[in-house]
Design a protein with these regions (language model features):
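C-terminal accessory module of base-excision DNA glycosylases/AP lyases that mediates lesion recognition
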Residues: 30-31, 35, 53, 68-138
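Alpha-helical ds-nucleic-acid-binding substructure associated with the helix-hairpin-helix region
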Residues: 4-64
């Protein structure tokens, strides 16, 4: 059995706060994790596969400790959504500005990134990689 199969909402919710703290998580993050794990609202609603990205982000940010950036990263890395552009991510912003120094405002960056639709998640990966001199496996 893979460890991923043993990390469940129920298992996390049953952990004492100290167990999460001992993993190196901050008290605040540990409390957020326990709060989400013990919340009755499903993290992913029924039919989430059919929801558009913005609707899913609106659902996720209702959980305490989940902001737009966290929700976008979840869509990119966990749900493998292909067209997420995270302008709340400093690396993405720096990467876009490296490609087009004139793109300073959010609307200007969105205009640059419009050419990458419907693969803006992959564009984020390339933008992050362009800033990192050491190869990284995602």
């Amino acid at each position: 059995m893979c460890i991923r199969d043993r990390i469940t909402r129920e298992a996390l919710g049953a952990l004492p706060l100290d167990a999460l703290l001992s993993c190196g998580l901050s008290r605040q993050k540990s409390q957020y994790i326990l709060g989400i794990a013990n919340d009755e609202t499903p993290l992913l609603p029924d039919g989430y596969e059919e929801l558009d990205d913005e609707s899913l982000i609106r659902h996720l940010v209702k959980f305490k400790g989940v902001g737009p950036w966290t929700a976008e990263m979840m869509l990119i890395f966990s749900l493998m959504r292909p067209d997420v552009l995270s302008l709340g991510d400093l690396g993405v912003v720096k990467g876009i500005r490296m490609l087009d120094p004139q793109a300073q405002s959010k609307s200007e960056m969105l205009a640059v990134a419009d050419a990458w639709r419907p693969y803006r998640s992959a564009a984020c990966w390339f933008l992050w990689r362009s800033l990192d001199p050491v190869p990284v496996e995602y």
